[in-house]
Amino acid sequence: MSKFVFVTGGVVSSIGKGIVAASLGRLLKSRGYSVSILKLDPYLNVDPGTMSPFQHGEVFVTEDGAETDLDLGHYERFTDTAMTRLNSVTTGSIYQAVINKERRGSYNGGTVQVIPHITREIRERIHRVAANSNADIVITEIGGTVGDIESLPFLEAIREFKNDVNKNDVAYIHVTLLPYIKTSGEIKTKPTQHSVKELRSIGIQPDLLVCRSDKEINEGLKRKLSGFCGVNLNCVIEALDADSIYSVPLSLKNEGLCKQTLNCLELEDKECDLENWEKIIHNLRNPGNPIKVALVGKYIELGDAYLSVVEALRHACIEQKALLDLYWISAEMIEEKSAEEYLNDVDAIVVPGGFGNRGVNGKIEAIKFAREKNIPFLGLCLGMQCAVIEWARNIAQLPDASSSELNPDSENPVIHLLPEQEDIVDLGGTMRLGVYPCRLQKNTTGKELYNEDVIYERHRHRYEFNNYYKQSFLDSGYKISGTSPDGRLVELIELVDHPYFLACQYHPEFLSRPGKPHPLFKGLIKASQEKLEQSN
């Protein structure tokens, strides 16, 4: 029988609930408990798949093909546990399910209301995660901030949830902010008191307070919060601003978050094994020489749009004992000026995924620069498609070569729509999504990096390499190092006479973990280090 932990946030948005939930998951797993983490998002979109990266950040893709909130990436990276579509719930998906049931007559003509129908559907989703994962502990993060009207059905649902299970099977954690007023030199607790008061008015009494602060919280403040908020003194947890998100589990462990959560759930506080995690933090805090990596994207104004790519680069640098020096380069800026102006001093170039025409020519110019100047390069999804277009235009002498997405009238569509996508009208949840196998070819860099015959990678795309141009591509110095098992789809390409030039149609960043960097990212950083050593 699973136990349940609910994580809410107060005072301000972006308080770090996702990192707290992921860190608790890491701490519980280090004690031998199995964990699954669920995100409840209070927006009306069915999923974030069609949302702008500028508004929502990256869309994280699960093994079973769900387009989810980026917090699921944190959950997977911290716990090294794969999540599924069940782990991502939005208000839109809840209402859609309830309305579909009403249309089918499932409510026997009854009046459908937020209470009990919407809240019951939410509770059923949480129970479904527990049943599907068979986890010892299910952690549920409630998106938004206590007091938001959008979050009310979720908060009511988790209030009701304690009636579904035994009292000691549920714990409520409230993440809040203690602002420091510089002029008075004081940390203020009043916003937290009001946030907890709001929770109590709904019927939820938090068991633990996780207090975000950039100043240390003294014993007196903890006692004050304990008294005003009705929380045991040992359950007032300090969460100071950290130098890295990966150091948060260790600081929360020292504050007793996991121990007190287990105490609330009446579970054994087993011996904790964080030795590998401590090694990761040691390498992170004691890096070697910097590696200057240019991330050439079209959504760089919001760093979260490429969150998993950045974390994958960080994991590789931690493993290789290098300092990640990340250059955020707008592809449109390269179009306006030149690749040389922005990329001349970098050690590696990454061109990530994206959609649409904007900035594509800048990406292509960056790839050309990497190819001609022998700069280690990694292309992801659209990055691979741009690498193929760059080859066609500059090596194969097909100046009008393009993708049928970018130029439907091109006479040389070296990238074209997957056949199964041709009759699809809806945008949401209809791409090639989730894990697919890829067979690696012998005597390729890809095979050497993975050291596997068949790999499994996550996808999110509609367009693929046009096999009509395959032989011409191979004859010009490129290798196709990975394909679908039937050989129909090109998944991984590489340039032969180059220090490191690989591009893949899939998204390897979703499978990178701290302590277990993805082979393609590790290979990129290693190649950059080797090239630097040779130049010195």
From Swiss-Prot:
ATP binds at S14, I15, G16, K17, G18, I19, D71. The keyword Magnesium applies. UTP binds at S13, K188, T189, K190, P191, T192, Q193, K224. Residues 1-267 are annotated as: Amidoligase domain. It catalyses: UTP + L-glutamine + ATP + H2O = CTP + L-glutamate + ADP + phosphate + 2 H(+); L-glutamine + H2O = L-glutamate + NH4(+); UTP + NH4(+) + ATP = CTP + ADP + phosphate + 2 H(+). Mg(2+) binds at D71, E141. Residues 292-534 form the Glutamine amidotransferase type-1 domain. Gene3D superfamilies: 3.40.50.880, P-loop containing nucleotide triphosphate hydrolases. It is an enzyme of class 6 (ligase). CTP binds at S13, D148, I149, E150, K188, T189, K190, P191, T192, Q193, K224. Its EC number is 6.3.4.2. GO terms for molecular function: ATP binding; CTP synthase activity; glutaminase activity; identical protein binding; metal ion binding. One of its GO terms (biological process) is 'de novo' CTP biosynthetic process. It comes from the Bacteria. The active site is at C381 (nucleophile), H507, E509. Homotetramer. Catalyzes the ATP-dependent amination of UTP to CTP with either L-glutamine or ammonia as the source of nitrogen. Regulates intracellular CTP levels through interactions with the four ribonucleotide triphosphates. NCBIfam families: PRK05380.1, PyrG. CTPSs have evolved a hybrid strategy for distinguishing between UTP and CTP. The overlapping regions of the product feedback inhibitory and substrate sites recognize a common feature in both compounds, the triphosphate moiety. To differentiate isosteric substrate and product pyrimidine rings, an additional pocket far from the expected kinase/ligase catalytic site, specifically recognizes the cytosine and ribose portions of the product inhibitor. This is CTP synthase. It comes from Prochlorococcus marinus subsp. pastoris (strain CCMP1986 / NIES-2087 / MED4).
